[in-house]
Amino acid sequence: RELAEAFHLPDTDNLNEEKLNDSIIWKFSDYTELTNENRKLLQEETGWSDEIVNAIKTSEEADVYKSAGLKDVNGNLERTDIDWGAKIPQDRIDRMRSLFGDEVADKWSDKTNLDLIREGKAPYGPDGERVNLHHIGQKPDSPLAELTNTEHKTNDGILHDKTKVSEIERPVFRKEREVYWQNRYNELTNQ
């Protein structure tokens, strides 16, 4: 019943408790849990570390990261398709201008993705949206995966266990993201 209320299902008082639980479990059991054998094969295929592979819960989740072409670097899954010299998309600058005025928009108009990460801000990905950091396995100390906004949104149900409350503390994660992107800047500029 708590899950039904969490998902705002209508008229749960008149539903049979067993049928309600079965329907909710069915909704979230469409995914294939990774077996030890699957984990071994995934690691051989991708070269990802034990920490990353062990944090992945389902084969569908693994497919999201593989399809994104993510590479294991320093225990996180990084994108290889970010154009670091690309400027902030013009539609974003135009939006800044309409919301905050010329002074703010002009300040940001010449900034590149590399400039953004130096300041601890997410770069723009190939979909023209900010890159999202995702905790693989949804634990606060999980490895991070760089996903486009599109990948993160369209795979929401695969990446996030909707049957439980998130363990990620948003204020802590906000600071973690800032430090992550600054470290990524240092990694890129010290090569």
What are these regions (language model features)?
Residues R1-V131, G137-Q191:
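Nuclease and nuclease-like effector domains acting on nucleic acids or nucleotide cofactors
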